[in-house]
Amino acid sequence: AAYTREFFSDNVYRYSNAGKYKNDPSHGRFDIPHAVVYLNYDFGKGWTMGSEIEFEHTGTGVSFEKEYEESGEWEQEVEKGGEVELEQFWIQKRFGRWLNLRMGHIVVPFGLTNAYHEPLHYFTVYRPEGEATILPCTWHQTGVSLWGLLGSWRYELQLLPGLDAMSFSRDKWIQKGAGSAMEFAVANKYAIALRVDNYSIPGLRIGLSAYY
């Protein structure tokens, strides 16, 4: 949980002169910016399942919102600014160290941040702006994955629904392409994602990812 002090007022006209009130100490906010729930289970005989549910700002719900374009009129909205995302929900069959078959909603390991998106794997509080600006982050889609370990190498090959090119932009490249305005992901085209990592040198990871 987090507590912050920031500018907020019920008087819409104060926003047109924010500099006048920049030192106003009377406003604060409690929030839970980010919470993640993991649930995994081992069925035995090589079968496992995994899931990851992410909550941002305590999730969605009904909230009141001030419309500044309508002279500060209050409106009741169905959604709050938070999010609830099912980032992973898959079942996996292990055939050996060298081959695992994973099916369901999976993370696409394109780029370093997506491949290692858990906060324990990077040093900053926020994800790197470079990747997060131009790539879906965290990039998760429903598909099939083959992955395994061969010596000091790790590979992963995925079959996925293709990105939505209508959501590409000049400023954010393919960032919005993994989303969908529907209740499902449109899969008129299919895509392949591949990632290869090498761990030959202790403490050093060298990787390459591709998407087609």
Annotate each PLM feature.
Residues 1-7, 25-165, 188-193, 197-205:
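Outer membrane beta-barrel
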Residues 1-19:
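Transmembrane beta-strand segments of Gram-negative outer membrane beta-barrel proteins
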Residues 12, 62-63, 169:
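Short acidic, glycine/proline-rich loop/turn micro-motifs
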Residues 15-17, 163-212:
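Surface-exposed beta-loop-beta
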Residues 21-23:
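Short N-terminal helix-initiation segments at or just after the protein's N-terminus
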